[in-house]
Amino acid sequence: EICVEFGLQSVHNETLKFINRCQTFESFLDEYNHFKLSGIRNCIHIINGLPYETEKMMIETAKKVGKLAPDGIKIHALHIAKGTKLNKIYQENPFSLISKDDYIRIVAKQLEYLPKTTVIERITGDGDKKKLVAPMWTADKISVLGGIDKYQAENDTYQGKALERE
């Protein structure tokens, strides 16, 4: 099966500019809505913990993506890797990084805004551990996945829950 993946990352234009995405959320929407007409399966990628994004902003990204009802979604935490422009920025002017506990809680909340028809293809990633600068907790994918499961069970939260209230 063919699937086209869209690297949206965030719905916030100031963030997209900072991470050199060379597109706005509005231009993404134009492309995405046009593409959806093709009927080809699609998947949207988002990143939590992007520089200067708040929890509210990350939840807003999930809400807006949820309204698009993509076929699939991949959610990642920001990875700062050696040899990248972002690493240089981080070394020169460190910014706050998302904690593992915050990531787990935010992902659980984000899932509430995603339709049950959207396949969750990934809820954490694990980049090259040899190149990872920060946050180091992202290297322990199993712990993150277990943390999300535990949080959801303890807080009676699940994919699509917020949509049931709308």
Where are these regions (language model features)?
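Structural detector of well-ordered beta-strand residues that form the stable sheet scaffold
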Residues: 5, 43, 74, 119-121
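Short, small-residue-rich loop/turn micro-motifs
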Residues: 8-10, 77-79, 124
